[in-house]
Each structure stands twice: as C-alpha cells, then as structure tokens.
Amino acid sequence: MTDSPFLELWQSRTVAIRERLGIGDQPNDSYCYNSAKNSTVLQGVTFGGIPTVLFIDVSCFLFLIVVFSIIRRKFWDYGRIALVSEGNSESRFRRLSSSSSGQQDFESELGCCSWLTAIFRLHDDQILEWCGEDAIHYLSFQRHIIFLLVVVSCLSLCIILPVNLSGDLLDKDPYSFGRTTIANLQTDNNLLWLHTIFAILYLILTVVFMRHHTQSIKYKEESLVRRTLFVTGLPKDAKKETVESHFRDAYPTCEVVEVQLCYNVAKLIYLCKERKKTEKSLTYYTNLQVKTGQRTFINPKPCGQFCCCEVRGCEWEDAISYYTRMKDRLMERITEEECRVQDQPLGMAFVTFQEKSMATYILKDFNACKCQGLQCKGEPQPSSHSRELGISRWSVTFAAYPEDICWKNLSIQGFRWWFQWLGINFILFVGLFFLTTPSIILSTMDKFNVTKPIHALNDPIISQFFPTLLLWSFSALLPTIVCYSTLLESHWTKSGENRIMMTKVYIFLIFMVLILPSLGLTSLDFFFRWLFDKTSSEASIRLECVFLPDQGAFFVNYVIASAFIGNGMELLRLPGLILYTFRMVMAKTAADRRNVKQHQAFEYEFGAMYAWMLCVFTVIMAYSITCPIIVPFGLIYILLKHMVDRHNLYFAYLPAKLEKRIHFAAVNQALAAPILCLFWLYFFSFLRLGLKAPLTLFTFLVLLLTILVCLAYTCFGCFRHLSPLNYKTEESANDKGNEAGAHVPPPFTPYVPRILNSSSSEKTALSPQQQTYGAINNISGTVAGQGLAQSPEDSVAAADQED
C-alpha cells in the first residue's frame, strides 16, 4: 500500500523539522537523562523531592490550621459571621434552618476546633437557604470532580503505574521517581498503546461525569426575570411613554406592565453609600452620648487617630456635630445629583410584560433570523414610533437578575467600553508575558553561578519545595491581578464579570503553571537560541528532553503545595485579613471602625475560584497518564478544597446571585483537561516514536476528532441564538417540571417595581421579595439587598456593595 502524496509531503516536512530540532528516528534516550547534569532543579533528590515536600507542606498546613483556629476565636469579625453577631447580639450566630432541627445555635463554633465538625454537619439544604443556588451548583461540581478522580486514581495506580514500573529504560533504583513515569518504557514496547487507550477512557469518563452534573443544574427561573427584556440602543431622548406605545402598537397581543429607563447613577450610588455610612456613624455617637451622657471628640483629619496632641490644623471636634455637618453636605449633593441624573439617560430600558410567553415572542422577533428568498432580514415588527426610536439599532435580551446588575457600570458603553477593555487587557498581557516560571529563574541562577557552590542547591528543600512554593505564590498572585483587571473592565452584570474572570484566570494559570514548565527549565533560552543563533554548537535542540523522567515530580510537588498550603491559606483568607487590619488601622473613629466591620464581608468570587480549581484539575489530568502518582495527591487537593469552600461559603462570604452560564462554562473548561492529556501523549509519541509510528497516528486521529467535536459544539453554541426554536422555553417540559417541583406562584403575576421614597430610612433593607430594576428613587433611597440572604444583616451588607 502506497502512501498518499499529502502524507508523503507531510512526512518529508516532518523529517526536516525533526532534523532541525536534532531529533532522529531513533533518539538517543541517554542524552536526555544525562544532559541536565549541570541543572540543580531535577537532580540529586530522593524520589523527586516528593517526600520532603510532602512533609514540609503538611507541617505548614497544620500550622495554618492552628493559626486560623486562634484567629477565628479571637478576631473572627472579618467576614460574614461578624455581620450576624453585630445585628443580633442577644442570640449570636443563631440562624433559621430549613432542616428538621429547626433553629441551630452556631455559637459553639467559635471554639478552637469545633468549626471542623460544623463543616461536616452542614447539609445542602442549609447551604441552599443561606448561600443560594450558585453555591450548591459549585459544590456539586466539586463532588463530581471528586468521584471522577477516585475512578482515575484507581485506574492510574492499579494499571498505569505497574505498566510504567515494568519498563527497564531507567535504572532499577527504587528511589528513582522516573521509574514511575512513561519515560521508563522503551519505544518499541506495545504497552504504550495502553496509555492512549486509558487517555481516551479518561476523556469519556470526564464527559459522563460532567454530563451528569449539568443535568443536575436546575434553576428556578423567576417570573420577573423571564418576563422582563433589557433593551439597548434607544435614542438618548426617548421617552418612557413612547417606548411603551411602540410595544403596544407593534405587538397588540403583548401587554406591557412597566417600562423603566436607565440613567447614569454611578455618582449617585457613591453619594448614597457615603450618606449611609455617615448616618450610621451619627447614630453610633448619638446612642453613645445618650448612654454615657458625655460628648465624644474626634480628629477627622487624615491619620488624625495617630495625633497624640492638638496642634494647629489638627484640632479635635465634636463627633455629632461633625457627622451632622457631613450628612447635610451629602444630602445637598445627592439632591443636586438627582436633578442632574434626569438629564443623563443611557439609551437603555427594562420592559416588563404580563407573561413570559410575551417576552419570549418579542425576543424571538428581534433576534431570530428570518430568511425571505435570497435575503435574510431581521427587521422586527414596526409601529408608528419605529423611526423615532430607531428599532433597527436595538439589541434585546432577557434581563438579568436585579441582584446581578452592576448599576454604576451601565454608563460605560460603546467605544469607550471597548477602548477601556482593550487597554486594560493589553497592559495585563504585556505584564504577565514576562512573568515566567520560577523553574527558569533557578536554572538561570545555575547558568550565571549566582549561588556558589552550585551543588549546594541540590538540597530537596531548595530544589523542589522552593520552586513549587514560588510557583504557587505566583499563581496565587495572578488571580488577584486578573480579578482587579476584570473589575476595571466595567461589566454590566456580575455573572458576565465572573465568567470573563474565570476564563482569563484559567488561561493565564494554565500557561504559567502547566505549559511553560512543561516546555523545559530553560525553554525560552532554547527557543531564542534556536531562532537566532545559527552557528552555536547547541543550536540543535533535543525537544524529547521536554519529557524528562523527573519532570512530573515538579507538578506533583505543585499539586501537594496547592492541596496543603493553598487550601490552608484560602481558609485563613490572609489577603482579606491583611486588608481588614489595614482598614481598621486607618479608620479615623470608632464609628468608622464599626463600619469597616460591617463592610468587610464580600460576595464569593465564583469565577476566580472555578479557575483556580480547574487549573489544578487540568494539571492532574494532563499528567495522570505520563505521571500517574500525581492523581491521589490531586484527589487530596479536591477533598480539602471542598471542605474549605463549604466553610467559607457558609461562614465567610455573602451569597451571590449569578446566571447558570458560569457553571456551564466551568464544565466546558473541565473538559479541556483530558484533551490536554491526549496532547501530552501525542507529543510524547511524536518525539519518541516518530510520525510514522502507528501509535502516533492513532493518537493524532483521536485528538483531531476530539478537537473537531469541540469546535462544532462551540460553533453551535455561538449561533444558537439564530434559531427561533431557542426561544420557546415556556414549552419545555423541563421548565414546567421545575416550576411544578418548586411550588412557585403562577408566572403571570404582574411586575410592579417597589420604588422607595427618598425619605426612607437607610437602615431598613428590602425584603427578599422586593426586587426592582433600579429606578432613580430606589437608588437614592435604600439600595436593594440580596434576595438570597436570609438575615437582615446580610441584606444590609449586600446593599452596601450594590453597584
């Protein structure tokens, strides 16, 4: 059988590339194992340094647990738990539970170790009631990953590991980590087929487990959200009555309940937050004067709390007089801003209809592609106001949850938003492009003899624990940088913000943690030498050295560091503790310190947490075949991560109300992990066996088919909105079943926004049923609280963070 011309051309081109890279048809394996003798990162340690790193990391984890227990006992007021205590001093930490136990007292959890048992005593019903549906879906995702890793651990340790140990390419030293990797097998060993088959099996298992998880994601679609459309592209001078008349004329069968135009209220939100803080401080000192009968004097100047004597320009003044003056000044600014807001429309509107089917019909009319002959037009139904309103430029979508909208960011749109987005991400990319791996830093130290004697680095603590700890530190810093960059992008919804955050953090972490270290310790140096230095004797680079026998030990140590140090630091929440301490020190008065305590609880960042966990999961799956010993440590990581997140979701963070798309996006990213495993096996086969090897061709075919399926799925997902059938959600049996099972009221209840008077007290939060799409009076009054929070204190805190 003769090869096709395409295959012959591809083969000749591949041979040329392999010769350019210094890869022969039968590579000299001993070259890779002996060429790194001057490197200090992967040699000279027992079993890749894993026992030493494991002992150090477990010791650090136990130390962090002790520190956290002490802090939780003595300084517990830097999280959500402080809000409950602040608002209910008579019965501290008493929460209404939906379980049969009724009211449960969590005061005992302030003990040094009693909080550990509380993690296991928490039921999903309690978490659902207190933290919302998103927390349940997040924890369910972790449980599916745990079950998947249990199966993968059994297969990798019971089948793949003995196969790797059966090889004889490396020495027989029982303390050699390389014997446990795929590098221990000869190139002519037929057992290499087993690795590819199990990689395909892992891919199938991942799809099955993730499919089961997605089927369990059932959101209770609120009637208010499904009946409300978000319209952008309106003329700035459009009137509420005109928009309402257009919908009634163009769609006579659809009854409009309410139309609310959007305005630029960013500054108004800021002023209302400051007024709320000022009123709380004024109330605090008023009550203190009534209780003690004495006036309190404060120094309101910047850093005035550090002044020990009264000097000119740093005088003390009466606290009640100061905060009364501040409140009056803020009230004047709020009144002026309310008048200006009326002249700053944004060209957006929320339109609520009588029934879900009406909103769905109009959404289909605006977005579905209607083909007539050879032309496809998407013009919606006209009315007498169509030209005035410019309906051809409208963009119509379902409205997000009221709690999900970032009101202050709605004013940033169009060219300004895109310019801001491109500028932020360009600066982020340039900055992170030069943030290389710590392994390259250590290898550079070796090259320039920074550390003398050079062999002193052969200690496992330096050569394995330090680089993995440094890598984890960089990967811990990266989400923080990306999170702040995402916040600066001014997304309109918190769901979109978390989704973009998850994607960006995951991509950057994968490049930093997995791809760059896998290219070799001096991969950048090799690349530029190969690209520019044509005369150097080292211009011929052996890429098969990427799969060094001990290369997997670095990633095993990274997973161990993430499991113990990473989860320990996440439980401790050191960045939040440092920020809390700094804000408490910089607070000028006792009332300000009280406000700091009440504003210290934040919503859970599902996007960043998903990305962090998926990065480690991808590392585990990518090396589950080539380095099977990594899988049980990955299982330990996910188990500890699950326990830590259960604690933090319930006791430390405020609930968040997000769209379900972020959970489906996490599933899609999880499917990338076994695909990377196939990539690793293909590269190994290509570099070690050659292109003509049957195993290489088979792995390439499987990988190509997998990528094609993923691309097809992604493309269909991108163009799904063009199908009119996509909008017939009210006909779905699943939706009907969800509504029947949830025992919700009929979805045709008319939407009436709860507009609060501007004179309402700022200390009274909205009830969970008081959902509104943010009229001006609502923002100048009390900001809507979180509908999920079951305690008034959480509602107040969520209102303070409303954007």
From Swiss-Prot:
Span list, region Intracellular linker IL2: 218-413
One example of a Gene Ontology biological process annotation: regulation of nitric oxide biosynthetic process
GO molecular function: calcium-activated cation channel activity; nucleic acid binding; osmolarity-sensing monoatomic cation channel activity
Extracellular topological intervals: 1-51, 167-190, 444-461, 532-553, 624-627, 689-693
Localization of this protein: Lysosome membrane; Early endosome membrane; Cell membrane
The organism's place on the tree of life at top rank: Eukaryota
Pfam families: PHM7_cyt, RSN1_7TM, RSN1_TM
SUPFAM superfamilies assigned to the protein according to its UniProt record, in alphabetical order: RNA-binding domain, RBD
Entry's Gene Ontology cellular component terms: early endosome membrane; lysosomal membrane; plasma membrane
Main location: membrane
Subunit structure: (Microbial infection) Interacts with H.contortus GAL-1 (via domain galectin 1).
Family to which the UniProt record says this protein belongs: Belongs to the CSC1 (TC 1.A.17) family.
Protein name: Mechanosensitive cation channel TMEM63A
Native organism: Capra hircus
Lineage of the species this protein comes from: Eukaryota, Metazoa, Chordata, Craniata, Vertebrata
